[in-house]
Structures are given as structure tokens and as C-alpha cells.
Amino acid sequence: MEANEERCILLKYPHPSSDISSEYLLLELDDDLLKTLEENPEEEIVFKSDFDKKASVLCTSDKTYAVRQVVQSNSYLLFDELSPTDWVLNDTCYSFLEVERIYGFIFSDDKISYWDEDSVELKPISLTKDQFIRSVPASRNEVDSFLQKNFFMVKNEFLYRLSPSYICSIIDWIFVIAQQLHIDFASFEFKILKKPAMDDEFDWDSVICVLESISSPIKDNVLPKKFNIDLELTTFWYGRFLLEGINSISSDEFIQLWDNRLPYPCKGLPSLNLLKGYYFHDTPNTIQYLSGDQLPREPSRRFQSLFQLKSKWLYEELWSFVKDLALSKSRVEALILKYGRKQTSRDGVYINSRGTW
């Protein structure tokens, strides 16, 4: 199955007298997936190719499952009838599909064009939102959440991502206008910025996109809906964009550069804790940018990539780059001990590589 293809099937309980198709697969449902189907019989099930095209994932509207074919030495007997007095053997089956809940893996590659202040005239080519959803091994709701949190917008029916420089210029503008209009960041309506945006020739769709990515709605059931700008989240994005363009830098120097770049309300907030999972210490006193998006999804290749960067990791630092490999903490810890050796010292707990890679 190609990465941009999908096959939708509707799972329904068959009537006992219905014929069993000669083409079938047995699917083992875990409790969570079974509950979903029982509560919503019309739930759409989508099979998609993983990024490496060597495996498939199963997606409901909001969850993603890894799919693995299990081959057995014994067999399942499949009967036409459920009557205990008149069973007719239809076929035997030596394998079934096993599903395991995982995090959807979403990566925005060069198929999604950047949109910036010059794009109004250029009209870059991109994908539609539905095309993008079909191309990534994740559920629709997981993709929707990712797009909203990462500065993506739909423009002229196509999906675009805002460029980092354009994002920062819009955020700088938002904070300047907010100060002029005495806007309370803890509770305000987006529409109050629309006229200033038009006056200053900012694309309103882009402004909304940025606001949605750095703020959260206030859940008070009062209309019109109001939002709260998250200053720590805003600080995070400035730090991430800044570090992404730097090869290696001392931690103290980076914090100073980061703080200098921020709008006034975010001054003093920079901390490396905000960037966990987006940097690693290449030396004890210097850091480099690293994002999970750059790392393979398959566990052995993920650990291989990490241990090729350095053979010894502080446990907490390594955890930030492998925590998405499984939903349960115990499963992640088991993977760490499978591919690494734990070492305890006065400076903390470290994980050393088990292999030469």
C-alpha cells in the first residue's frame, strides 16, 4: 500500500447464516478497540502504510494501532454455522492480525509548502488537508491536533505551514498591538486583533493560525469564546526556532540569546526544561538541536541513531527521545534496558549503548 493510499472498511458483526468470504483476515481486538466498535458500530477503520512502507497501522477516528501478522503452528477452525449440532467446517486459518495501541507518527516533510509574507503573490503548491491526513500513519484527530499546535493552516483549500521567521514576526506584532490596546493575555477575543491586522497588512488567516498555536480556549461556556495566550509555550517556540539554526552552543550563551529575542512579557522565562526533547548535550556544557521528528520510528533504529550521536546518555535526556515508542512507561523502560545498559554514578543514572551499531 503506498504511503498516500488508504483503505476504509466498516466492521460489522455478521449474521450467523451469512456466507463467509473466501478472502478474510482474523483481527484480534484489544479491549479498548472493542469498546470503541461496540459503542459506535459505524466507526470508520482505516488501514494506512507506515512511513517505511514495511508495515501498516490501523486508525480509528482518534487512535492509532500498530498491526502485526501473527503466524501460529496450530490453526483456527472456521465454521459456517454456530449451531452445536450441525457445524460445517469452512476453512482453517494459521494467522491473525494483532493490534497494539501506539502514538500516531506525524511528520511534515517538504510536501507541505511554507507560507510567509511573500506567499500571497507566489501561491505555492501544497497538499490538501485530506491528502496529508491520508499520507501519515495517525488518526484524523491526532493529525488535527498536531496541525493546530504546529502553525499549519488551510488556505485556498490547501494545507500550509508558516515559516519560523513569519511566525515570530506575527507574534512580535501581536504583543506590540496587545500592549497598545491594553489587551489582557489571560482572557481576550481573537477578533479584537482583526482590524489592526488588516491595517498593518498582515494576513488574517496567518494571524489566527499563530494565535491558535500559542493559546488555549477558556472553558467557561461563555460566548463569544475567549482565549489565553500561553507565555511559556510562546517562549518555547522562540527557543526551538532559535536553536534549530545553531550547530552547537554553550547552554548559558543560548539562554542569553533566547531571552534577548523574546517579546517583553516572556522575558526571564527561558529554561532548558521548556525544550526537553528538542536538544541534547553534545558536551557537558554545550547543546545541539535534536527533534524526535528526525529520528526513526522503529525502536532498534531509534536507539541506533541516538547511540551514534553519543554512546552514553543521561537517563532523563534519553527518555525525552524515546518516550513516544510505547504508551506505557514500563514498555518504554523495557526498551531502554533492551538496547542500553544502566549505570548509576554520583552524577545520576546513565544509559550506555549495548551494541557497536
Curated annotation (Swiss-Prot):
Q: Which keywords describe this protein according to UniProt?
A: Cell cycle, Cytoplasm, DNA replication, DNA-binding, Nucleus
Can you list the GO cellular component terms from the UniProt entry?
chromatin; chromosome, centromeric region; Ctf18 RFC-like complex; cytosol; nucleus
Pfam families of this UniProt entry? Dcc1 (PF09724)
Question: In which broad location class does this protein mainly occur, judging by the first location in its UniProt entry?
Answer: cytoplasm
- Please give one Gene Ontology molecular function term for this protein: DNA binding
Q: Which InterPro entries match?
A: Dcc1
Which GO biological process categories is it annotated with?
DNA replication; maintenance of mitotic sister chromatid cohesion; mitotic sister chromatid cohesion
User: Where does it reside?
Assistant: Cytoplasm; Nucleus
- Record function comment: Essential for the fidelity of chromosome transmission. Required for the DNA replication block checkpoint. Replication factor C (RFC) complex has an essential but redundant activity in sister chromatid cohesion establishment. An RFC-like complex (ctf18-RFC) is formed where ctf18 replaces rfc1 in the RFC complex along with the association of dcc1 and ctf8. This complex is required for efficient establishment of chromosome cohesion during S-phase. Acts as a PCNA loader, loading PCNA onto primed templates.
**What name does UniProt use for this protein?**
Sister chromatid cohesion protein dcc1
Q: What is the phylogenetic placement of the source species in the record?
A: Eukaryota, Fungi, Dikarya, Ascomycota, Taphrinomycotina
Gene that this sequence comes from = dcc1
